[in-house]
Amino acid sequence: MPEGSGPFPAAIICHPHPLFGGSMDNNVVNSLFATLSQESFILLKFNFRGVGGSEGEFSHGIGEQEDVRAAISFTSEVAGVALKKMAIVGYSAGAAFGLPVGFEDNRIKALVAISPPFDMSDFEFLRNCLKPKLLISGGEDDFIPSSRFLEFCHMLPEPKEYHIIEAADHFWGGYEDIITTKVTAFLNSVL
């Protein structure tokens, strides 16, 4: 919790795919959490159902979207949260689960997708999204060709921002600081 009385912007961070080792303790999630907490954000990171000590089991995005809805409701009730300054930050499958919910929920003002898995989920809803959005991909990401990422981003309506970090792959080892810098600057500018 930031010091002071607020209200403070808030971000809900959604982790990568549960079936491939994704959890709220992922390197990207932890780096974002550490950096944004120093920027006076109220933050929530959580494990999707069936991960860590969470109840339930993976349900191919359906239950995970319910988890995101619950996280938004929980965060919106935390004292000190600026209700018009909330964002969803999703990494990989976390973007696939979190961004559609954030798009539909009027409490969410901004969306961030890190390594959005276009082959796993349909991100076409973003073509109708007028909320500020940031998309980041690694130039060496084996799951998302840079050409496809750029083609998709070019078709999105404003406001938008997108970046390819040339030497980074899908897992961002050693590039966490670059991600956190881009995400922090974006959220500070739109929230």
Can you annotate each of these PLM segments?
Residues 1-79:
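Serine-hydrolase catalytic machinery in alpha/beta-hydrolase-like enzymes
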Residues 8-11, 132, 160:
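Alpha/beta-hydrolase fold active-site loops
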Residues 66-131:
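Primarily recognizes the serine-hydrolase "nucleophile elbow" in alpha/beta-hydrolase
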Residues 129, 134-137, 141:
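Short beta-strand/loop motif that positions the catalytic acidic residue
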Residues 140-144, 170-171:
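Acidic catalytic loop of the alpha/beta-hydrolase fold
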Residues 145-153:
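Short alpha-helix in the alpha/beta-hydrolase fold that links the catalytic acid
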Residues 155-171:
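Catalytic histidine neighborhood in serine/cysteine hydrolases
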Residues 168-180:
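Catalytic histidine-centered segment of alpha/beta-hydrolase-like enzymes
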